[in-house]
Design a protein with these regions (language model features):
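Short, conserved catalytic or adaptor-binding loops enriched in Gly and charged residues
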Residues: 2-6, 164-168, 187
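Conserved glycine-rich beta-strand-loop-beta hairpin in the small C-terminal domain of fold type I
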Residues: 187-193
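Rossmann-like NAD(P) dinucleotide-binding subdomain of oxidoreductase/dehydrogenase enzymes
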Residues: 1-73
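ALDH superfamily catalytic-core signature
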Residues: 43-180
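Short acidic/glycine-rich loop or secondary-structure boundary segments that cap or lie
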Residues: 182-185
């Protein structure tokens, strides 16, 4: 940042962050804007601070790819992002919304970068492995699909093996074409799918 002419101390971090250090930063009069990710408590603290704030809890960040994109670069960047730490970080790419006229090219380039494309039947099989039904917390509440915590952060190779697909170590993530309402789009999986 300094080499590019930016100001000193524009980005700072706390060596050992705690709720107390977060509260100090939030309440410090010299801090004019806050940005944080975390659980609902952290986000609530930021948004109720009275300061400009950007807060995000659990996320399922989308990527939008249109026909102005450098498709080979977009594919590489998406795969690199969603496979970093097996897609655990809430900032990593979780799903792509792609214009039809570039979808085929994007998929082909994703395959070149370590993705494995599964079909609709395999998507259904995979749902039964990586998702479970929640137990309703209140009377009348409907169960919904939630992540199977046994598969959080697992390698794509191990996940695919559960549905009978054996791949090499070069496969870093699993991709599929699906509808917006499909559970993989609506649920933060925290695994390379």
């Amino acid at each position: 940042i300094l080499a590019a002419g930016g100001p000193e101390n524009i980005v700072c971090t706390v060596k050992e962050p705690t709720r107390e250090t977060s509260a100090k930063m939030v309440n410090d009069p010299s801090v004019r804007m806050l940005v944080a990710t975390g659980g609902p408590g952290v986000v609530k603290m930021l948004l109720s601070s009275g300061k400009k704030a950007i807060g995000a809890g659990a996320g399922n960040p989308p990527v939008v790819v249109d026909d102005t994109a450098d498709i080979p670069k977009a594919a590489k960047d998406i795969i690199d992002g969603c496979t970093f730490d097996n897609n655990l970080p809430c900032i990593a790419e979780k799903e792509c919304f792609v214009m039809k006229n570039v979808a085929y090219e994007l998929i082909q380039n994703m395959l070149k970068n370590g993705a494995y494309l599964i079909n609709a039947a395999q998507v259904k099989q995979l749902e039964d492995v990586v998702l479970v039904w929640s137990k309703p917390k209140k009377e009348g509440e409907q169960p919904k699909r939630v992540i199977n915590k046994d598969w959080v952060g697992r390698d794509a190779k191990k996940i695919l093996a559960q549905i009978g697909i054996n791949v090499g170590d070069d496969i870093r993530c699993i991709i599929c074409e699906t509808e917006f309402s499909q559970a993989f789009v609506q649920t933060e999986l925290m695994m390379p799918i």
